[in-house]
Every structure is written in C-alpha cells, then in structure tokens.
A protein has these predicted regions:
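Class I SAM-binding transferase module
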Residues: 2-104, 108-380
Length: 380
C-alpha cells in the first residue's frame, strides 16, 4: 500500500514496525549529513533490539504497530473521527446510562472515557498492544478506575468478568474500510457477549467507488519506472500498479458518478461477509481521461436519537483514512454519459488475513475507447 503523504498510522499500517531512526519516505530523496550520521553513531548504545522476534506472526506485527504513540496521536487529532464518536456518546446517553459496555480495540481508552462520562455502569476496554498499559494509567489519572477495566490481550483469547454486555463500541475501520480485518474481531465479540437486543456502534458502513483523472501523479508514481536514468525498471512498475495508494485528491478530479458497492450491517452480518463481489456502473459526468478508481467509505450510527454519520469521501472534511486510489493499467478516454461497467471482488489475503486482495473487472465501450480488463491489487 502506497502513500503520497506520510502519516503515523499510515506508516504503521504500511510497514508495521519502524526501527528508531528509520526514515520512511515515498517518492522523495532523504539526505543525511555527516553530523547527523555521527550523532546516530554516538547514540548506538541505545537498545535497538527488535520489538518482535523473527518467529512472531504477522498478527504480532499488527498489534505492535499500535504500540507507537504517533498512531494514536494521529487518530485522536482526527477531529471528524473522534468528535463523531464523542457526539454519538454524549448526545445519546440513554444508550450508555447504567449499561455495561465493551470497547473493542480501545487504544488510549478515549472511547471508554467518553462512555464512562456518559454514565456507563462499567466499561471493559480491550487492547492487545502495549498501549493497554498506558490506557490503564490514563484511566487511573482521570479517576475512572472504578468504572473502566482495561484488559490487555486479544479479544478472541480473553474472558470478560461478565457473561454479557449491553453495548459494543469500536473504531475498527481501516483504509479501504476493511484493511486490517478488525471487523471480524468486533463480530466475534458481538456473537460471544452482546445481549440479544444490545447496541453495537457504529452499526452501518458503506463502501463507495468512483473514478478520477490523475495524470500528473500517475506519471510520477507509476510511469517513472519505465525509464530510470536511462534504465528499464518496468518490472517495479508492475508491482507499483498492484499497490493501492492512500491519499486525498481534489474533488475536481472526479470524472464519474459514485456507486455504492458494499453495505454492511454490523448488527447482523456474518464474518464471511467481509469477502464479497459486487457489480458496478460508473457514468461519466464529462469528457475526460480516467487514470484510477477511488474507494472511500461512510460510517453510520443509526441507533441514536438522530442518525449520526461521517464520510471519508473526497467531498467531505479530511480524515486520517483519506481515500484509496487504484491505478489503471491503461488510460481510459471517456465521453459524458458513457458507462464503465464491471465488478469488484474484495477478500482477506489467505496467508495474512489483515491484508486485502482486490480484483476489479471493468469494461468501457465508448466512442474513443473500447476495453475489457481485469486488474489485481494487494493492500498490505
């Protein structure tokens, strides 16, 4: 998975573990002067042993990535994300008053703190990363130790001190909505602990697809590999094409309509529903070129007094999720009113279910362009 602009959560979701002092830059040149190199050498007595042994699984890398403070800082500073959850809880205290709440993937414990302040009887905050230790201290510092219990471990492996909970709350969404596959953990918790008429927040999620013109960046990101200082490195181009890019873009780049490709009801869906194939039709809204498909998602809290939602779409206020860009092998020339038809298939990677396999079949039978192609993408 690529990035135009580096971010803490972005780097962690892409690289999982960055050693101290490691530079992680996409499409840029890093220059380290002699003085900085000397400073690094002098600091080599710092314990730089890997956080995870070589025999650990990809799941361990995933959880370790969320031990980094920068990831949580980025998420907390995402005003759209955090204020939406805060508004859901504070404006709908009837959902939490005297209720037992389970916070899945609690991180710093911010959602648990919101729930406790809204009158929850007790909150169980489950966090598998080292951040659980910080969450315990945060809870204690803010005077909620009698209301919030932080449990360190995987949801699938822990046992709650209670047989059931009234509410499950979680911020499980990844890039492209489903990257990292945390939703299945929420569904596991739902099936094991949530009472029959219990509340799950959020309870709906919508995944959309559109198409954009992006000639300038595709040239810089993809076509660059065809001629690198006179050498053919196009084998890397093939890999770059298969790697979705997470970034924002100007809404003026949108060429087609938007189409809903997946609607999820978190209260009722099965874990297998995270894999799906959906047809789509995108209608050109002007004459232009198309260089990429773009995916984004909306999240809904429909069990509130009044439905609350937010969007990660290009026309909405930016979030740390940005959008996911899937570049096309061939540039499409399209005229207003012409239709791109196809299907999108999304499924977890078999070896590492936190990664995503995305396949798009698409065709255009237009005035200037006739194509029928299949492209495969790997989000990791």
């Amino acid at each position: 998975m690529g990035m135009r602009k580096s971010g803490a959560k972005a780097d962690a979701q892409k690289s999982h573990v960055l050693a101290p002092g490691t530079a992680c830059v996409e499409g840029a040149r890093v220059v380290v002067d002699d003085e900085e190199m000397e400073e690094r050498a002098e600091s080599s007595n710092i314990d730089d042993s890997p956080l995870i042994g070589a025999d650990n699984t990809s799941a361990d890398y995933y959880f370790d990535s969320y031990s980094h403070f920068g990831i949580h800082e980025e998420m907390l500073k995402d005003v759209v994300r955090t204020k939406t959850y805060q508004n859901v809880i504070y404006q709908n205290t009837f959902l939490f008053k005297n209720k037992v709440v389970l916070d899945v993937g609690a991180g710093t414990g911010i959602l648990s703190l919101f729930c406790a302040k809204a009158g929850a009887k007790h909150v169980y905050a489950v966090e598998c990363s080292q951040m659980a230790d910080m969450a315990k201290e945060i809870v204690r510092t803010n005077g909620y130790s009698d209301v919030i219990t932080v449990l360190k471990g995987k949801v699938e492996e822990i046992e709650l001190p209670v047989p059931h909970v009234d509410v499950i709350i979680s911020e499980w969404m990844g890039y492209f909505l489903l990257f990292e596959n945390m939703l299945n953990t929420v569904l596991y918790a739902r099936d094991k602990w949530l009472i029959n008429d219990g509340v799950i927040l959020p309870d709906k999620a919508l995944l959309f697809l559109t198409a954009i013109e992006d000639a300038e960046y595709k040239e810089d990101k993809i076509e660059f590999w065809n001629n690198v200082y006179g050498f053919d490195m196009s084998c890397i181009r093939k890999q770059a094409m298969a790697e979705p890019l997470v970034d924002t873009f100007d809404p003026k780049q949108i060429v087609t309509s938007d189409v809903l490709v997946k609607k999820m009801d978190i209260s009722e869906m099965a874990s297998g529903d995270v894999s799906f194939t959906a047809p789509f039709k995108l209608i050109a809204e002007r004459d232009d070129y198309i260089h990429a498909f773009v995916a984004y998602f909306n999240v809904l809290f429909t069990q509130c007094h009044k439905e609350i939602s937010f969007s990660t779409g290009p026309r909405s206020k930016g979030t740390h999720w940005k959008q996911t860009v899937l570049y096309l092998d061939e540039v499409l020339t399209i005229c207003e009113g012409e239709i791109i038809e196809g299907s999108i298939t999304v499924e977890p990677n078999k070896k590492n279910p936190r990664d995503l396999e995305i396949t798009i079949n698409y065709s255009l039978n237009g005035k200037h362009c006739q194509v029928s192609l299949t492209q495969h993408y790997k989000m990791r």
